[in-house]
Amino acid sequence: FIGGIISLIKKLF
């Protein structure tokens, strides 16, 4: 879901 994608992006960056 949206929240999950944002969390992954924050972990990558």
Swiss-Prot record:
Tissue-wise expression: Expressed by the skin glands.
Keyword line: Antibiotic, Antimicrobial, Cytolysis, Hemolysis, Secreted
Species of the source: Pogonoperca punctata (Clown grouper)
Physiological role: Has lytic, hemolytic and antibacterial activities.
Source domain of life: Eukaryota
A single cellular component GO annotation: extracellular region
GO biological process: defense response to bacterium; killing of cells of another organism
Protein name: Grammistin Pp 2a
Keyword field contains Kinase: no
Subcellular localization(s) per the UniProt record: Secreted
Family: Belongs to the grammistin family. Group 2 subfamily.
Main location: secreted
